[in-house]
Curated annotation (Swiss-Prot):
Protein residues bound to heme c: M70
Lineage: Eukaryota, Discoba, Euglenozoa, Kinetoplastea, Metakinetoplastina
Protein name per Swiss-Prot or TrEMBL: Cytochrome c
Free-text description of this protein's post-translational modifications in UniProt: Binds 1 heme c group covalently per subunit.
Keywords: Electron transport, Heme, Iron, Metal-binding, Mitochondrion, Respiratory chain, Transport
Intrachain S-S bonds: none
SUPFAM superfamilies for the chain: Cytochrome c
InterPro entries: Cyt_c-like_dom, Cyt_c-like_dom_sf, Cyt_c_1A/1B
Record's subcellular location: Mitochondrion intermembrane space
GO molecular function, one term: heme binding
Length: 93
């Protein structure tokens, strides 16, 4: 479930792609990565990406945030979400 090693979306200062750069996502406010065009729903959500919030979001992004541009259907298995969140937590200074 994790992003491949060396993925630009995970690198500090990496480029935005289909989604925003994920470096430092845990603890960051939704819709705030410079240079990425977010949906209005994401920009206006006020969501803070904590591990708990990411768990709910990653299960079903469109249910969690109606109007999101996220095309990913979600991770139904709790362990897959936990593994991905643990990985995302390593992407920080």
């Amino acid at each position: 479930a994790a992003l491949p090693p060396g993925d630009a979306a995970a690198a500090q200062g990496g480029s935005n792609g289909v989604g925003p750069n994920l470096y430092g996502i845990v603890g960051r406010k939704s819709g705030t990565v410079e240079g990425f065009t977010y949906s209005k729903a994401n920009q206006d959500s006020g969501v803070m990406w904590t591990p708990q919030v990411l768990d709910v979001y990653l299960e079903n992004p469109k249910k969690f945030m109606p109007g999101t541009k996220m095309s990913f259907a979600g991770l139904k298995k709790p362990q897959e979400r936990a593994d991905l969140i643990a990985y995302l937590e390593t992407l920080k200074d």
